[in-house]
């Protein structure tokens, strides 16, 4: 099993991470509660809805959003057809996030963002495609890579949870900067995504 091989690699390559893995225990299914693997648009909608929120708040907001559309992710056409203020109030979204959802829908409908191509692209190319959409920054693109496309070797150096978990696990004097994080994570390659899941889990704060 791919995860077993990844865990074995992480355990053997980093004694600090090995101890953390032992402490955290088995991980759950990263796809639980998420849009289907073939629903790229739904996954991006979920990512936007959860930006800059706690894990619990993100799940609540996304649940309210899908409840407005028969408990499923909305289509691009449905987002654009909905009245923005009504959507904002019903789901508890900020006005900025409503504008981001509309921008995403417009990019998909116009063909500027070809979701069906993303699986064929490398990680950096996927990021470049996504950050061209208003409201989708590097962090959002990396979450999409990790949790939807299930790319195995992603390290989101801007994620506060990962920084806090590294600071605690490695007994750092302060939150690590990107260079420090890259250096710590080098031995984890090509399983940095899996390592990050353990780091999040150590804080009980895996994005959901």
Kindly label every feature range from the protein language model.
Residues 1-32, 98-99, 112, 119, ...:
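C-terminal accessory module of base-excision DNA glycosylases/AP lyases that mediates lesion recognition
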Residues 18, 42, 46, 58-62:
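Short amphipathic alpha-helical segments
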Residues 36-40, 56, 74, 95, ...:
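Residues at secondary-structure transition points
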Residues 36-52:
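Alpha-helical scaffold segments that form or flank carboxylate-/histidine-based iron centers
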Residues 43-48, 64, 83-86, 125-129, ...:
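A general alpha-helix detector
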Residues 53-134:
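Alpha-helical ds-nucleic-acid-binding substructure associated with the helix-hairpin-helix region
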């Amino acid at each position: 099993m791919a995860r077993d091989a990844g865990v074995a690699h992480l355990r053997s390559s980093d004694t600090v991470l090995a101890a953390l893995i032992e402490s955290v225990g088995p991980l759950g299914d990263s796809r639980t509660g998420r849009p289907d693997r073939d629903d790229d648009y739904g996954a991006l909608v979920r990512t936007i809805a959860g930006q800059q929120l706690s894990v619990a708040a993100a799940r609540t907001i996304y649940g309210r959003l899908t409840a407005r559309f028969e408990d499923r992710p909305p289509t691009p056409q449905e987002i654009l057809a909905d009245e923005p203020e009504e959507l904002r109030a019903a789901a508890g979204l900020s006005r900025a996030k409503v504008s981001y959802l509309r921008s995403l829908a417009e990019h998909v409908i116009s063909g500027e963002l070809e979701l069906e191509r993303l699986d064929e692209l490398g990680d950096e190319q996927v990021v470049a495609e996504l950050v061209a959409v208003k409201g989708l920054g590097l962090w959002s693109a990396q979450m999409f890579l990790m949790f939807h496309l299930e790319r195995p070797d992603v390290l989101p150096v801007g994620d506060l949870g990962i920084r806090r978990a590294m600071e605690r696990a490695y007994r750092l004097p302060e939150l690590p900067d990107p260079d420090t994080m890259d250096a710590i994570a080098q031995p984890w390659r090509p399983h940095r995504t899996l390592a990050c899941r353990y780091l999040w889990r150590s804080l009980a704060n895996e994005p959901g």
